[in-house]
């Protein structure tokens, strides 16, 4: 049996009618995911963004940024990561569906890890609670109200922007990519791109956590990991759309 004939058989086995819509949604979501790292970089180069971001030192600075540039404030507190993780959810479900015939247990393990990581990350996000506090601060009528809201915002900033769920999400995607390497549905190139990208970003998280920042070498690793993940999104998205059309 030729390679193309084998692929047709695999597609026929995998693309059950009830799952085709999920494959299409997951494929489109994966392709959209490519835009998020590009948007993150593009925003950094917009005029005035660097100055506004560096000016957020106190909680009042943050409230002012929220009132004048709410999108930038949300973005600085991880908005694109939040939206990106949400977009990745249907893609992970679609990958699990494609893998369930041959590797259901490991696929389910990776999928569960992903959603646990997503829940932890969303629960620890400071973006929307800070937006709510800034809105209340803007309409507060007494000094006591403003002082109370400022104290609540300061406590939130003191806790820091939680990234506890991000390494878990990356590890889940690493598990899923490893499973695809052993399966027949996705190409080896797709699996390797996912393994490399997620492994590198896990290393970046470890470096950033242990050193309290990201040295130049860490930025290089992050760029390589980001490019690998973008490649993974493209390859996964294309393959899922193929399954959705079968």
Predicted regions and their residues:
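Hydrophobic, aromatic-enriched alpha-helical segments typical of multi-pass transmembrane helices
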Residues: 2-246
